């Protein structure tokens, strides 16, 4: 388990319909406690992993750049430092009276979960024309779900529906003209391992919500006969026959809608990707490339710039919204680890996306994610932005120094950076263009800083900073919320101060 594994639900058949028990309790309520006593439970899971993601600008390693356009993928990857479980939030069924005291705290802790994804970008073309071409359809160089389960030790998975004499393989069609993905109908013995049946059901649900015109939605969503209902029923009955029939019906319907042009027309009218779709694609990529090798990321050095930690997709999506990142912009992640954020920017926003990482193991995994990213985007019929991942020291790599001069948004997860590294980064702000936004977990501008004659030439005088909050489940090293900063390069204040001295 690793970075995106918290997005998977627990249990072998975790997606089957549950029958919640709802109890109404009538009681005389004591006088409500004062608001100060109302509790907002904040859970902090194991603190074994250090804060922040690893980035270290020294000992620069091999300098290879991997670009999206038909080049070998060599992108930077960042994976979570520790293998921790993120339990699915428990849904409570209670009376209205009981809920009244907890609504405020619940909304505060879960606000990020209910927010929508980035604003529509009318300049972005979501659909990949190549992915919908019926000519010369060839197998994609992707890792099939069946490859994950078949390569594991035989004892790690068991048949989901029994029947030792029957084959377990099943094919799933995606919205594009690409060939189907192979899955095995098995469940993991360890609840943290890959769950192919969950993935199938999630894919069908995401496709029905994001690719299907409203006029065709009943086939998927009808509460009695819809595909999603049939899948839940098959799992509840533990019926392989019903499950295969439902998937086969889904495959036929998707192929019909694609050939009729309905899916393409729907995508062409879409100008943003919803976050659940983004999360599903990123989760698939991570599960097929990084998760099987996540142990290689366990090596880190406390007290150095090589401590590893991740910003999770919903938090990153919030950053994209706050900075108003658009498809025509340039995004740079300094210390990109296994490349998760670089890929998310290219996928969710469609912008040119860059990352730089120097930890060799993370870079190796980034290259695997890069390759899978291209194939998965094609499978889902999406045209992402160009991605460029660079190995080496982001303070010294010329390609990064050059791209920073035209960057619109720069992300620096400096939670665990040493003061020396933070100071060295500041010097690069001089070359950034006006209006460039620098997002960080620690502010580069000290609280209460004022422009004075004695610090007139400090680069931080060019920055206008605002502080924002991130909520629970936003970072990999803690469940507790915190603060982050967006610094905008704005020379007007410094110019005004200099003019006042004349």
UniProtKB/Swiss-Prot annotation:
<dbReference type="InterPro" id="IPR025789">
    <property type="entry name" value="DOT1_dom"/>
</dbReference>
<keyword id="KW-0539">Nucleus</keyword>
<dbReference type="GO" id="GO:0031151">
    <property type="term" value="F:histone H3K79 methyltransferase activity"/>
</dbReference>
<dbReference type="GO" id="GO:0000077">
    <property type="term" value="P:DNA damage checkpoint signaling"/>
</dbReference>
<keyword id="KW-0677">Repeat</keyword>
<dbReference type="GO" id="GO:0000786">
    <property type="term" value="C:nucleosome"/>
</dbReference>
<feature type="binding site">
    <location>
        <position position="357"/>
    </location>
    <ligand>
        <name>S-adenosyl-L-methionine</name>
    </ligand>
</feature>
<keyword id="KW-0949">S-adenosyl-L-methionine</keyword>
<dbReference type="InterPro" id="IPR030445">
    <property type="entry name" value="H3-K79_meTrfase"/>
</dbReference>
<dbReference type="GO" id="GO:0006281">
    <property type="term" value="P:DNA repair"/>
</dbReference>
<dbReference type="GO" id="GO:0031509">
    <property type="term" value="P:subtelomeric heterochromatin formation"/>
</dbReference>
<dbReference type="GO" id="GO:0042393">
    <property type="term" value="F:histone binding"/>
</dbReference>
<dbReference type="GO" id="GO:0005634">
    <property type="term" value="C:nucleus"/>
</dbReference>
<keyword id="KW-0804">Transcription</keyword>
<feature type="compositionally biased region" description="Low complexity">
    <location>
        <begin position="35"/>
        <end position="46"/>
    </location>
</feature>
<comment type="similarity">
    <text>Belongs to the class I-like SAM-binding methyltransferase superfamily. DOT1 family.</text>
</comment>
<feature type="binding site">
    <location>
        <begin position="331"/>
        <end position="340"/>
    </location>
    <ligand>
        <name>S-adenosyl-L-methionine</name>
    </ligand>
</feature>
<keyword id="KW-0805">Transcription regulation</keyword>
<dbReference type="GO" id="GO:0032259">
    <property type="term" value="P:methylation"/>
</dbReference>
<feature type="binding site">
    <location>
        <begin position="393"/>
        <end position="394"/>
    </location>
    <ligand>
        <name>S-adenosyl-L-methionine</name>
    </ligand>
</feature>
<dbReference type="GO" id="GO:0140956">
    <property type="term" value="F:histone H3K79 trimethyltransferase activity"/>
</dbReference>
<keyword id="KW-0156">Chromatin regulator</keyword>
<dbReference type="Pfam" id="PF08123">
    <property type="entry name" value="DOT1"/>
</dbReference>
<keyword id="KW-0808">Transferase</keyword>
<dbReference type="InterPro" id="IPR021162">
    <property type="entry name" value="Dot1"/>
</dbReference>
<feature type="region of interest" description="Disordered">
    <location>
        <begin position="1"/>
        <end position="121"/>
    </location>
</feature>
<feature type="domain" description="DOT1">
    <location>
        <begin position="181"/>
        <end position="502"/>
    </location>
</feature>
<keyword id="KW-0489">Methyltransferase</keyword>
<protein>
    <recommendedName>
        <fullName>Histone-lysine N-methyltransferase, H3 lysine-79 specific</fullName>
        <ecNumber>2.1.1.360</ecNumber>
    </recommendedName>
</protein>
<feature type="compositionally biased region" description="Basic and acidic residues">
    <location>
        <begin position="106"/>
        <end position="121"/>
    </location>
</feature>
<feature type="compositionally biased region" description="Basic and acidic residues">
    <location>
        <begin position="57"/>
        <end position="72"/>
    </location>
</feature>
<dbReference type="InterPro" id="IPR029063">
    <property type="entry name" value="SAM-dependent_MTases_sf"/>
</dbReference>
<feature type="binding site">
    <location>
        <begin position="308"/>
        <end position="311"/>
    </location>
    <ligand>
        <name>S-adenosyl-L-methionine</name>
    </ligand>
</feature>
<comment type="function">
    <text>Histone methyltransferase that specifically trimethylates histone H3 to form H3K79me3. This methylation is required for telomere silencing and for the pachytene checkpoint during the meiotic cell cycle by allowing the recruitment of RAD9 to double strand breaks. Nucleosomes are preferred as substrate compared to free histone.</text>
</comment>
<dbReference type="GO" id="GO:0000781">
    <property type="term" value="C:chromosome, telomeric region"/>
</dbReference>
């Amino acid at each position: 388990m690793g970075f995106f594994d918290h997005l998977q639900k627990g249990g072998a058949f975790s997606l089957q319909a549950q029958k919640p028990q709802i109890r109404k309790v009538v009681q005389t309520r004591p006088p409500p406690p004062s608001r100060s006593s109302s509790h907002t439970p904040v859970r902090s899971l194991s603190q074994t992993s250090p804060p922040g993601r690893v980035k270290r600008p020294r000992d620069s390693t091999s300098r290879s750049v991997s670009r999206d356009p038909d080049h070998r993928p060599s992108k930077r990857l960042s994976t979570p430092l520790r293998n921790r479980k993120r339990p699915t939030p428990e849904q409570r069924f209670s009376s209205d009276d009981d809920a009244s005291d907890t609504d405020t705290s619940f909304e505060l802790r879960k606000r990020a979960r209910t927010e929508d994804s980035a604003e529509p970008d009318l300049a972005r073309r979501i659909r990949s024309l190549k992915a919908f071409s019926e000519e010369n359809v060839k197998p994609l160089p992707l890792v099939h779900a069946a490859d994950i389960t078949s390569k594991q030790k035989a004892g790690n998975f068991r048949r989901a529906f029994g029947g030792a004499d029957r084959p377990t393989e099943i094919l799933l069609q995606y919205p594009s003209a690409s060939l189907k993905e192979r899955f095995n109908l098995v469940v993991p013995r360890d609840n943290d391992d890959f769950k192919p049946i969950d993935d199938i059901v999630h894919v069908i649900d995401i496709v029905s919500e994001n690719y299907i015109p409203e006029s065709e939605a009943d086939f998927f969503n009808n509460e009695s006969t819809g595909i999603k209902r049939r899948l839940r029923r098959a799992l509840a009955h533990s019926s392989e026959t019903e499950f295969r029939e439902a998937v086969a019906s889904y495959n036929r319907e998707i192929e019909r809608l694609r050939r009729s042009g309905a899916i393409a027309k729907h995508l062409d009218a879409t100008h943003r990707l919803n976050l659940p779709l983004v999360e599903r694609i990123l989760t698939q990529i991570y599960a097929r490339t990084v998760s099987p090798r996540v142990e290689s990321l366990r090596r880190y050095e406390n007290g150095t710039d090589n401590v590893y930690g991740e910003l999770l997709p919903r938090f990153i999506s919030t950053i994209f919204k706050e900075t108003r990142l658009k498809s025509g912009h340039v995004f740079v992640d300094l210390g990109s680890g296994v490349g998760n954020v670089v890929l998310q920017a290219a996928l969710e926003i469609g912008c040119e996306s860059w990352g730089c990482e120097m930890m060799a193991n993370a870079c190796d995994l980034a290259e695997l994610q890069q390759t899978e990213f291209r194939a998965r985007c094609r499978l889902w019929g999406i045209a992402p932005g160009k991605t460029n991942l660079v190995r080496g020291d982001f303070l010294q790599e010329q390609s990064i120094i050059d791209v920073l001069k035209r960057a619109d948004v720069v992300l620096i997860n400096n939670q665990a950076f040493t003061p020396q590294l933070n100071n060295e980064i500041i010097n690069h702000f001089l070359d950034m263009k006006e209006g460039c936004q620098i997002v960080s977990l620690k502010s580069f501008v000290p609280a209460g800083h004022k422009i004075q004659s004695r610090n007139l030439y400090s680069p931080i005088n060019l920055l206008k900073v605002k502080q924002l909050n991130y909520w629970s489940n936003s970072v990999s090293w803690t469940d507790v919320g915190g603060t982050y900063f967006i610094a905008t390069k704005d020379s007007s204040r410094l110019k005004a101060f200099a003019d006042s001295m004349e």
